[in-house]
Amino acid sequence: MLTLFIVLFIVLCGVAEPPAQASELPIIKDSPIPDFQNRPQDVTLYDFDAPPQGLFRAITTSEGFDEELGFHRTHEIVPVKPTNRFRPDTPAIFIVFHLHQHYQGFQVFGRCFPEAVAGLDPTVVIGQDAMHIALEDESGYLTLSPPQDAWKPGRYKVEIHVGEQVNEMSLMGTMRFTIAAASEE
């Protein structure tokens, strides 16, 4: 009786039939590498004429900065009155930034050029600053002072470089700010 029950169970469950064979997959020709890797439509070009990205979590121009105790009990630099429009009598313009995690120290450089300022050559550096970033630093700032006693009205750009020295390979991006004429305030 038991053997009859086992035979019926096997027949009803379909175990007695041979397993169905999977159909063979067709053999296809190898695809060329450009069809699936390094495709032009997948690549977005990095814009060096825009605020830096990648290493920088946030970067802004401001009228000042403050130092606070950060989450990991580190010194965190925060912007005070962030803006990109300043008055001609502004004593200094600050570029405050927050960084992603990094595994060695480096320097952040800022080089200021008069992009659209009457009477100033746009190819001549009118101010620069650098800050050494230690391994434990998560934020920092650059200070730009006016070239004379006051800023001339117009638009300025600041090239942000990262590394040990400024060269064509160290450029990370560009920040811009405007000095408003006294009548525009």
Model-derived features: where do they sit?
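Intrinsic disorder/low-complexity segments
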Residues: 11-16, 64
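Short, solvent-exposed mixed-charge patches
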Residues: 183-185
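Boundary at the C-terminal end of the N-terminal hydrophobic targeting segment
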Residues: 16, 20-22
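Contiguous segments within soluble domain cores/interaction surfaces
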Residues: 24-153, 159-171, 175-181
